[in-house]
């Protein structure tokens, strides 16, 4: 009897294949690969019915959750399968790779003071003494001693598959701008749910085999526990224990009701802790997860650096198999914005982004735009005299092709920054928007205007006028900042609908680092018509280097 187990995948998943081979060998099954392309993976096994049933049951227990694959179905095959690709008898799984069930086997059994020997060479530095080749009770006592130091408020050094870290309960210093951010590690899913504003898809992603980092905002009542972070209310990087020593240490700490520890990148040095040769590093991924479980890898360097948008879109068309074309929208924190229509080899820009970066000139244009504009600036000056003066004195020059700079301009007119700086104003507005706890903000106008070239552009002046009016109405900063982000997403959802109808194109590629903001990703998914087929970067970086 032959069965074909079919999976959906969005990236290479050697760990999946190694588990399948290992489980097949346990039951003495014949096996081979049946499907292997960008999105599908099939694994054919053959043998006696009882062995196949045990294989299926073992898979249901041992296959971990993953960001990059999930099981679709199993199909019975009639007769012998065709000659397919034969797989190596030895799994590719490394000595440090374990399924969740395999990792649990290394934890101490209830009532016992003994640990199973670790499968690689580990050394402990305890009380000035180096201890190696520990097993049984001695290994248990070494982990117990490390946990005790942490519980006493001290820090320890610990080697992980992502490098050497200093581990403590609260962190050892206040992070400065530009430094590596501390990682906040809840010791289990329940602790993550207790401490952070987190949705179920994010919890599921944290628990996957890849153990990614996700930016989460702490709940207000726990903010004092994040004193090492720069701006904790806007979000901190969170992950769960991602390798075996961290999982064992977490077990000892949880026994004393510890919910979370802090990891800070450490240089090679001396100190008490746990050390081993890191021969099989585990990739560290940062992801953004939407309410509908869309997962985007947001690390810019993933897959290699991309020099420009033309190169990026070529890679995205290829990996998503969009050879006939698509609408392509790119929204970045740092790079120019693009909105293209791609038809075969032809690529055409359908929207121009050319936004002046002079706040004083913009103020003047609003004041001279008729009675309503004059009245608006007069009222604004009366209510916010200091802010109005700063705007009128900001004689910056230049033009931007990045729509996010106009988000920053809105932030400056809302008083979120003392002196005009596009990048700083962007960060201030996005930070305020993250702190908003509601679901809907005020509707800020993002109107289009037709230009002499025939292309459409954004009527940026009216965007700022709308923001000024809401500020005069007394809308608080967080609500208004979220309204800007919400309205920007709605603007793009409506424009994608119109363009898809005009050009009879239902395929859309979305890219750019603005999608790494979860609130914006959720909103653009909400406002984009459901009949459109959205495609995102899979193995290609989310953005290019500007």
UniProtKB/Swiss-Prot annotation:
Domain of life: Bacteria
Protein name according to UniProt: Protein HydE
């Amino acid at each position: 009897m032959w069965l074909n187990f079919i999976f959906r995948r969005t990236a290479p998943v050697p760990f999946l294949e190694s588990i399948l081979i290992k489980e097949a060998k346990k039951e003495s099954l014949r096996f081979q690969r049946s499907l292997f392309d960008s999105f599908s993976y099939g694994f054919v096994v053959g043998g006696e019915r009882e062995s196949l049933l045990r294989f299926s049951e073992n898979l249901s227990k041992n296959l971990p959750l993953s960001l990059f694959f999930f099981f679709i179905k199993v199909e019975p095959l009639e007769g012998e399968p065709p000659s397919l690709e034969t797989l190596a008898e030895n799994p590719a799984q490394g000595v440090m790779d374990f399924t969740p069930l395999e990792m649990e086997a290394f934890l101490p059994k209830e009532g016992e003071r003994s640990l199973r020997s670790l499968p690689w060479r580990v050394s402990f530095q305890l009380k000035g003494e180096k201890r190696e080749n520990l097993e049984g009770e001695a290994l248990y006592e070494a982990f117990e001693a490390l946990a005790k130091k942490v519980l006493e408020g001290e820090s320890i050094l610990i080697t992980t598959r992502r490098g050497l870290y200093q581990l403590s309960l609260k962190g050892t210093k206040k992070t400065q701008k530009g430094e590596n951010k501390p990682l906040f590690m809840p010791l289990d899913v329940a602790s993550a749910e207790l401490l952070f504003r987190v949705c179920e898809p994010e919890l599921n992603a944290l628990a996957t085999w890849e153990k990614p980092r996700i930016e989460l905002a702490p709940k207000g009542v726990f903010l004092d526990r994040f004193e090492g972070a720069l701006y904790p209310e806007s979000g901190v990087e969170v992950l769960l224990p991602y390798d075996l020593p961290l999982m064992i240490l977490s077990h000892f700490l949880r026994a004393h009701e510890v919910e979370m520890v802090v990891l800070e990148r450490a240089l090679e040095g001396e100190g008490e802790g746990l050390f081993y040769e890191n021969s099989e590093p585990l990739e560290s991924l940062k992801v953004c997860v939407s309410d509908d479980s869309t997962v985007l890898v947001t690390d810019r360097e993933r897959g290699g650096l991309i020099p420009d948008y033309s190169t990026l879109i070529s890679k995205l068309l290829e990996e998503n198999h969009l050879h006939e074309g698509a609408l392509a929208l790119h929204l970045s924190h740092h790079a120019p914005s693009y909105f293209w229509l791609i038809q075969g080899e032809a690529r055409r820009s359908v929207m121009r982004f050319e936004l002046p970066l002079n706040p004083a000139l913009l103020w003047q244009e609003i004041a001279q735009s008729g009675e309503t504009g004059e009245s608006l600036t007069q009222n604004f000056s009366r209510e916010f005299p200091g802010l109005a003066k700063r705007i009128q004195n900001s004689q910056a020059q230049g033009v931007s092709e990045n729509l996010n700079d106009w988000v920053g301009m809105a932030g400056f007119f809302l008083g979120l920054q003392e002196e005009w700086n596009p990048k700083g104003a962007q960060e201030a507005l996005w930070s305020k928007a993250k702190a908003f706890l509601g679901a809907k903000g005020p509707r800020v106008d993002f109107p289009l205007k037709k230009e002499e070239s025939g292309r459409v552009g954004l009527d940026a002046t009216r965007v700022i006028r709308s923001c000024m009016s809401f500020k005069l109405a007394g809308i608080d900063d967080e609500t208004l900042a979220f309204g800007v982000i919400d309205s920007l997403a709605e603007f793009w959802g409506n424009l994608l609908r119109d363009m898809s109808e005009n050009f009879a194109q239902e395929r859309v590629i979305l890219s750019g680092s603005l999608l790494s903001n979860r609130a914006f990703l959720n909103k653009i998914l909400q406002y984009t018509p459901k009949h459109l087929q959205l495609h995102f970067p899979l193995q290609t970086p989310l953005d290019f280097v500007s």
